[in-house]
């Protein structure tokens, strides 16, 4: 039986744009999420890009979210009841700088997060804060074309300096960008890039990547100057790729797929562009424009830890058109015949999580942090002995299998700081903008048509996860 470390950080994760609501209260500006059309943002480049409308899209569930902005005390109390040691959320950039390019921050926005962090401290819960989680201020997308414009580095610098200074005694763990590699697949949602995906050149896309990487290194530098005790990490979307066959060409295709993701963690951990990317740049006519000081900034400000989301693995082949497509998978790929799939077509692979942990740790020898993992499902509220509940044994089974593989990785020698399940309370899906895709231990009474009371109900998994935390993982190995 694997033993989890004594000070292992168990908890859950959310994002401001998916659950706070209050999109137009207390001085908050619009973000790219507020103009997301019904149906969400497609994962694949070349599909439609959300229109930058004059105002928020009226059927957008994210405008109200689950009203965490007004209910945070109730929700934090529920997290504490489960025994959370850590809670991951994000600061909405547009709540602090409504347009993104102001000189002075919005005090009401800063005060909200003061209140939230104080509430977490009351219960001894450590905040883990993402600085930018798919929430670029809309003005920066409209006026500057998001991270395609180098000016965003300066705006981001002002923002992170503001929040690092304000919360230097309240927050220890920080993430610079959520799933930073996702900008390759969802440039508007992830990078605020307004150019339609089908018109966006690889040159401009990878230049935007460079701007984000420089901004991340700059944030790491500033954070360590403001408080040397800060622990600052990068956050990537982790997705191991398996070759479809032992054919060397398929093995190479899997390696090339993984390199596109390793690029981001390599630069964060090693402080320079890896050699393997040079061929890709050359073959695609990409020439990254470095400003004076960029290389030194990257080299001197590597991260303290690597964090990642993990939902699935993919299969790669040199001739993918000859195989069935895994259309539900985040980044497409080939259907793996050996794996089951979720209701949304995401293939379920607990062993893949062990592989990711070992791959990252072998590669970097840095502490790791699993900051997203979970099962999106259509939950049904039923009457239980203690009131309405959800009999979500499928979620318990999913999480148990994944956490047992985490235990195996710990036995393998991986250094892991903690684990936060995604959407510990039901929230609006980032990719599909619906509430029926539920991840939480806590059911929120809100439906895809916007109806509902917003009441909170504990699912069966609530008590299960509470026991996992109370036993520091030992209950995972009990029938």
Describe each model-derived feature in a short phrase:
Residues 71-92, 300-306:
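Catalytic domains of carbohydrate-active enzymes, especially glycoside hydrolases
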Residues 65-77, 98, 109:
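Internal amphipathic alpha-helical repeat/solenoid segments
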Residues 91-105:
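Glycine-rich, proline-tolerant flexible connector loops at the mouths of alpha/beta enzymes
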Residues 1-56, 80, 99-101, 110-479:
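Active-site region of glycoside hydrolase catalytic domains
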Residues 57-70, 148-150:
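Active-site mouth loops of central-metabolism enzymes
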């Amino acid at each position: 039986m694997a033993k989890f470390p004594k000070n292992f950080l168990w908890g859950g994760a959310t994002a401001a744009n998916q659950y706070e609501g209050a999109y137009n209260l207390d001085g908050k500006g619009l973000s790219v999420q507020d103009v997301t059309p019904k149906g969400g943002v497609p994962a694949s480049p070349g599909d439609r890009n959300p229109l930058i409308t004059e105002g928020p899209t009226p059927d957008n569930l994210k405008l109200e979210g689950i009203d965490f902005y007004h209910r945070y005390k109730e929700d934090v109390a529920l997290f504490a009841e489960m025994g959370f040691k850590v809670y991951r959320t994000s600061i909405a950039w547009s709540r602090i700088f409504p347009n993104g390019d102001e000189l002075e921050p919005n005090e009401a926005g800063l005060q909200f997060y003061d209140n939230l962090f104080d509430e977490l401290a009351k219960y001894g819960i450590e905040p883990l804060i993402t600085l930018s989680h798919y929430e670029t201020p809309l003005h920066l997308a409209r006026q500057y074309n998001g991270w395609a414009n180098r000016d965003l580095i300066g705006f981001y610098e002002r923002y992170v300096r503001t929040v690092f200074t304000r919360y230097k005694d309240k927050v220890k763990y920080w993430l610079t960008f959520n799933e930073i590699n996702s900008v390759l697949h969802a440039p508007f949602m992830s990078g605020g890039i307004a150019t339609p995906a089908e018109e966006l050149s690889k040159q401009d896309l990878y230049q935007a990547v460079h701007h984000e990487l420089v901004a991340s290194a700059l944030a790491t530098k500033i954070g360590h100057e403001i408080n040397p005790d800060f622990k600052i990490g990068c956050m990537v979307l982790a997705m191991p790729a398996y070759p479809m066959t032992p054919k060397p060409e398929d093995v190479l295709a899997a390696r090339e797929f993984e390199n596109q993701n390793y690029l981001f963690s390599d630069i964060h951990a090693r402080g320079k562009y890896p050699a393997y990317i040079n061929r890709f740049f050359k073959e695609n006519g990409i020439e990254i424009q470095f400003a004076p000081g960029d290389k030194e900034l990257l080299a001197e400000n590597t991260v303290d830890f690597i964090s990642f989301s993990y939902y699935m693995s993919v299969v790669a082949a040199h001739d993918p058109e000859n195989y069935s497509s895994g259309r539900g998978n985040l980044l497409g790929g080939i259907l793996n015949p050996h794996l089951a799939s979720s209701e949304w077509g995401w293939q379920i692979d607990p062993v893949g999580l062990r592989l990711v942990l070992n791959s990252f740790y072998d590669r970097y020898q840095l502490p790791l942090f699993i900051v997203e993992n979970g099962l999106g499902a259509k939950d049904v509220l039923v009457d239980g002995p203690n009131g309405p509940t959800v009999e979500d044994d499928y979620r318990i089974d999913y999480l148990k299998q994944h956490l047992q593989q985490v235990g195996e990785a710990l036995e393998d020698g991986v250094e892991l700081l903690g684990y936060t399940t995604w959407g510990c309370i039901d929230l609006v899906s980032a990719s599909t903008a619906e509430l029926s895709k539920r991840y939480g231990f806590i059911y929120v009474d809100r439906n895809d048509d916007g109806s509902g009371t917003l009441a909170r109900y504990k699912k069966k998994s609530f008590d299960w996860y509470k026991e996992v935390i109370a036993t520091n993982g030992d209950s995972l190995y009990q029938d």
